[in-house]
């Protein structure tokens, strides 16, 4: 698993190589991210990444995810359309070869709870993360 310093260096390198522009903010690991590969913060321009994609077995997904978040970053700072629906976003994402979606990873054990109504016998399943 790579640490935050290595992540910062990787983001800075990919930004220069793929976009020709420096990344001047922070790249962080956010353990609360579960269903997405990363997130661009509009308020402070920092990038956050899901730690599942920083594990050795998932590192091959990371450059595509970093490029995706950097597309948001560079377009927003340039005053262009940075949202997924915007044409500018779609064109730049395709140009740099970023991931459109983060792949779904096998998560650590999830609990499934089974409930049965005592009156009617109806079964209910609850899945906890």
Where are the regions that the model predicts?
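Active-site-proximal or metal-binding-adjacent scaffold patches in catalytic folds
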Residues: 1-64, 73-129
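Walker B catalytic acidic pair
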Residues: 69
